[in-house]
Amino acid sequence: MAAAAAPAVAVNGGVKVASQAYLESKAVKETRVLISDLCRQFYNLGWVSGTGGSITIKVHDDSIPKPNQLILMSPSGVQKERMEPEDMYVLAANGSILSSPSPKPYPHKPPKCSDCGPLFLKAYEMCNAGAVIHSHGMESCLVTMINPLSKEFKITHMEMIKGIKGHGYYDELVVPIIENTAYENELTDSLAKAIEEYPKTTAVLVRNHGIYIWGDSWISAKTQAECYHYLFDAAIKLHQLGLDWSTPNHGLIQNVKALIGSNRDINTSVKAGLKDSNHGMQSLPGCIVLDIEGTTTPITFVADVLFPYARDNVGRHLYATYETAETQDDIKLLRTQVEDDLARGVNEAVSIPPDDAGKEEVIAALVANVEAMIKADRKITALKQLQGHIWRTGFQNNELEGVVYDDVPEALEKWHALGIKVYIYSSGSRLAQRLIFGKTNYGDLRKYLSGFFDTTVGNKRETRSYIEISESVGVDRPSEILFVTDVVQEAVAAKGAGLEAVISIRQGNAPLPENHGFKTINSLSEI
């Protein structure tokens, strides 16, 4: 085993990591053995067959900062299942080779450090990794070929997602896909760009090739590698069954060509229509605007979950964040609203003392006003903005989770596949809307939404609000917009602005007046 001449690096005034003594230390020897053991295991899994694939691990030493720790790397072009501990390369943190394996007799080729070396070093540099695995597992190759144009692999609602760092069962796991090249080292820039654009990822797929996976330690990298390969295999098998692995309910794959007709022009055929036995098939507008309460989400969720949470936590929130610019802005808006309420004689409005009266007195008055506003279900910006900030804390602390009807995710996915833009218009703040759809009982649905509107564009029962929306969503005519709501007065206002409007009928919604004149639906799947 040859040791290359390299500058010795002193760590904390102790042993030099590039010294011969350190290269022969127990930590280095144990890491050599570990890599050879893992390569045999990975060979049996099909990850490193045909001399392909590789693994690298940093030599863990508590006395040495991770960026300065030695790197052990398997060689290239060798039978991975037959490697011995002495076959490993030892590199300094900057990538210079400190020790290389001795040549073996014919038919073995001369030793060569892994072709993956530059990519391994990039993962160490950008992700502070402790180990990196490069797999040629068949499943990691096939998932990139199912959709040859896709730049991402996505999957959600699978138990093994929990094994990926920073992810849970309801989360959407996204793995970037980069294009393969003739030589491994040519992938380095693409890998770096993917890591930069996907800061949460711990893996990058290479189309028609394999995957790079890293972790804080060899255990983390190995565990995640096993989970990634499981999820890829699951996606392939779901695809074979005609099921969509990327959606929460893993329903049937929506074949867009079959849905819109393979012999028809997409621009005209996407108007799939509104199915209503009383009115026949109507053409679907270019974009859809959805209300939340009673349309996508049960009214009870807002009334029985969100409002009580805001009411019960307003005091705690104001005390904890009183000095922040955000909360001071909230207080300023509330002051203006309360002053207007007092001038108009609104019941239960309480004068808010000036700031110099003391934090406790100001907060007590704010709490009294906010509780009264919530009780009266007032649709005012000052209240909605503060509620959004309170709810944000609840969602971040996993104390809140959005609820949508079972038909909502599939409908959103279908419209998204057809290129139909979908917006939300609610009396709740845009922040609150993003929170509700960002963490639902079906995962993150924001990827299907093009934007959010709140009362800053106007009251939902005023026609001018819908005129403002129609001028913001990029349609040629207001009639190209379909507005879905459970409130007749809102439908009337939308119709007055030239929008198409339908009424959502859900359990718990308020009864509709007779002869209201609008189409009705019981599920978004009817659109």
Swiss-Prot record:
Transmembrane segments: none annotated. Its EC number is 4.2.1.109, 3.1.3.77. Residues 288-527 are annotated as: Enolase-phosphatase E1. Binds 1 zinc ion per subunit. CDD domains: HAD_EP. In the N-terminal section; belongs to the aldolase class II family. MtnB subfamily. This is Probable bifunctional methylthioribulose-1-phosphate dehydratase/enolase-phosphatase E1. It comes from Ricinus communis (Castor bean).
